[in-house]
Amino acid sequence: MLPSFQIATAPQLRLQVEGDLCFDTVRAEHCDAGGLWARDVAPGSQLCIDLGKIGRADSAGLALLLHWLARAAQRKLTTRVESVPESLRGLARISEVEDWFDSDPSAGRRV
């Protein structure tokens, strides 16, 4: 199932991801997260990325998630990733990027 994205802005900026995040489904156009990066969002705002409705996930999904986190850091957003499936968490753990799922731009972490 191809991924789809829903963006909510109240009470906080929230990206709900649904579908599979794997080599078969992740495309370059998904880097824009359903138009999220075109929105005018103030630095310091919080972004929640909810992965509770994704199916399969592999390293392509992890790469996409890390891209989104890097984009959020560039815009100085505080990010939180919710409902990370164990398959994705395991890949993040062995890649030593699991701590990127909760980020604070003031912490000095380079994404």
Task: Give residue spans per PLM region.
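STAS-like cytosolic regulatory interaction modules
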Residues: 1-60, 67-111
